[in-house]
Amino acid sequence: MNNKMNFRLILVIAFAFILCNCGSNKRDSLEVNITNGLINAKLYLPDADTGYYRGVRFDWSGLIASLDYAGHTYIDQWFDKYDPYVHESVLGPMQEFESIDFNSTAVGNPFLKVGVGILTRIDERNYSISKYYTPVDLGKWDVKTGKNFVEFTQILESQIGYSYVYTKTVTLTKGKPELKMTHSLKNTGKKTISTDVYNHNFFIIDNELAGPNIQTVFNFNPVGTGRGLGDIVEFQGNKLVYLQELTRGDVMIQSINGYGPTPDDYEFRLENLKTKTGIRVQCDRPLSRLRYWSRNTTYCPEPYIAVFAEPGKEFTWEYTYTFYTW
């Protein structure tokens, strides 16, 4: 009798051990760590059931959970409450493609968000970034990883004329304090894909709150209008500086102008003057629009580029993030 009980106990323990291991492996499969010896970064991987982000606003790929260089940190949770389906439960340099065919689509019919999939228009109101539009087809994601890179590929084959292969590769450059995001959008459908994409750049450098220790330096002298401009922040030459700490509410500069038509002006530096570190952001495509948003826990230049791919064609672009100290 004792032998039987011992045998059953061993089976129960073994089964529990297997379950625990399976669960931990599945959890581990949703994130990956990469390094080039200078920069260390952790990325969350896309998954419709258990992914960190399951909202319908931002591109699901390339979500960087944390990044450190030379003893400094650049990405952390900036929002108060986490919910995988909330539109802003994202971190780091996240991209959003503007919706395609939303305005011409009747309620109950589908529209496209590149990097998310085919979604359903749920009411007559204008498109809202905070609204959850019911997914119809989220496509198929494939992920490849290496020591210093993660490659994300989404394949979408829809019934509404839009199909594509979208690839984003996040790479830590060997021997440099540099991160590159390279993109390819291959139009495999019948309709032209024409939209804008921007990078929200949810940075929080060394956990410094928005205030006089934070500044953004542009490649041109910016001008613009918006909420908080003049009392909380102001333009000083080619810089955007904080006049005081941002304790509540937000800053929203809807339109920043002054840039030229070449990629040279898609360059800015986000700096923490207190800890003497910063991030330089560049792109190989020209700006189509530029905004700036901030709350007390993050400061976000929002640069847009135009994306255009006719059927059978491919559109490419690349962001470069360089981390530095002084």
Model-found features: residue ranges?
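Bacterial N-terminal signal peptides that target proteins for export
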Residues: 2-10
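Compositionally biased, low-structure terminal segments
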Residues: 8, 16-18, 59
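Hydrophobic h-region of N-terminal signal peptides that target proteins for export
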Residues: 13-23
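Surface-exposed acidic/polar loop and edge beta-strand patches at domain peripheries
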Residues: 25-174, 178-180, 188-194, 200-326
